[in-house]
Amino acid sequence: MKTWKTNLEETKQRYINWWNHKGIILSMWEHFQEGVKPHADIAPPAPARDLSQKWFDPQWRAEYLDWYVAHSSLMADMLPVANTQLGPGSLAAILGGVFEGGEDTIWIHPDPNFNDEIVFNPEHPNWLLHKELLKACKAKANGNYFVGMPDLMEGLDVLAALKGTDMVLLDTVMQSEVLEQQMQQINDIYFKVFDELYDIIREGDEMAFCYFSSWAPGKMSKLQSDISTMISQDDYRRFVQPFIREQCQKIDYTLYHLDGVGAMHHLPALLEIEELNAIQWTPGVGEPQGGSPKWYDLYK
């Protein structure tokens, strides 16, 4: 693989060091294009006809991302990677959630026909879209950049997208045993989906993730539970921790996205997961950002 990033091997080594808790990576979550000399003479596609084409036309997105990466800065440790996200938590769409394309993001609405059955349909259009998008991007990339893993998400967040957050919170009390079974079913489907998508995007054993500018020499994923801000520590250890632990045991490199001060009370449970490689901290709206001295004790 010979990418447009001239110092990729040095960046890979810094990532390997970082996964082993050594050194730092100098990067950013998104690319910037101002003042960048294009890496290749690639023209942008014609403007998207509508939001549906912008997000859900694999060929159009592949052409757009090819142009985008070709015109993006790859300085320092910024990765050459196509952002293939189909909305945060797109595993929910694979399981029946409803896509809606917005100007800047994709929304996933609850399945109006959801009946508490967690079913993976290999012919579901949203699953086929994931595969078609990644295959189109991989063909267009031609080894010049990585194709990122979409932001599938997992667990309670996926179920909340399928049936609504309020209903999932009620389930922790009203049908807790059913909820545990659903968490295992979602995890089982997650691994099937992840592995099939990994086989499309992998470069040897290596892969990149569409968010957080992440690369690893093997399977890698970002994990999270945003709904955890609304549940107790006991419920987290019952409905979240075991399934995050299973993901960390089965995926080589894992990064947990701890989002907001409301989720901080679950940090002890996260630290109990020995296989978890790293925690990414986002303080949230109205709080000083990650470099603030306010969080130094947290980092210690």
Give the residues covered by each predicted segment.
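Trp/Phe/Arg-rich N-terminal binding region typifying the photolyase-homology
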Residues: 53-55
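A contiguous, low-structure linker/loop signature
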Residues: 81-116
